[in-house]
């Protein structure tokens, strides 16, 4: 029979949650920056401009 596990402490739970939120915020910031550069036409990523012009 399975034994009950110990409860995760609030501080550990909050640490993990804050790490996840920090990573999510960083990714959101990068995505917004890329979207702005694509919108202004200053993107240095290959194929982005050609893909946008094909769809328009």
UniProtKB/Swiss-Prot annotation:
GO terms for cellular component: chloroplast; large ribosomal subunit. The keyword Transferase does not apply. It is found in: Plastid, Chloroplast. One of its GO terms (molecular function) is structural constituent of ribosome. Residues 1-20 have a biased composition (Basic residues). Keywords: Chloroplast, Plastid, Ribonucleoprotein, Ribosomal protein. This is Large ribosomal subunit protein bL32c. It comes from Mesostigma viride.
